[in-house]
Amino acid sequence: MTLGPVARDADTAAFFDATASGQFLLRHCPACDAISAPQSAQCERCAATGLDWRPASGDATLVSWTVSHGKPGTDPVILCIAELAEGPWWWARLEAAEPEALSVGAPLRIAYRHPAPDSEVVPVFVPDGAAAATG
């Protein structure tokens, strides 16, 4: 199963500008200093709007995963939920060779992939220490 094209809109432009340069952005609340997931329109702690963007460290911890089996003739894909070092949870593809070797709490890193010429660069997770080359 391959990653399909991902398109930006006005709400995601800053996020995808950052992923294109190898950076993952989170939402920051100037009112209470809380960090929220990138898709947040208001602060998850105080409900303030007017959030700004802050770069994430790229470190994460595996919370859960599943193996998705696509159409016949395609390779299965590992999809995961990871807790970012800054607190928010994010789900994405996990590029790991052996799903059987995964364990809750395993350290992960964010890597970036450009799945198609007409697609935005998207974040994926890789086991910490794995090559994080863009491709």
Region annotations inferred by a language model:
Residues Q23-L26, D33, Q39-S40:
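Residues immediately within or flanking Cys/His clusters that coordinate Zn2+
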Residues H28-A31, Q42-A48:
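Short, cysteine/histidine-rich loop/knuckle motifs that typically chelate Zn2+
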Residues A37, G50-D52:
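Short functional micro-motifs and their immediate structural scaffolds
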Residues T66-K71, H114:
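Short, conserved beta-turn/loop elements at beta-strand boundaries and strand-helix junctions
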Residues G70-I81, S119-V122:
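Short aromatic-glycine-enriched beta-strand elements
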Residues H114-G135:
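OB-fold/S1-family single-stranded nucleic acid-binding modules
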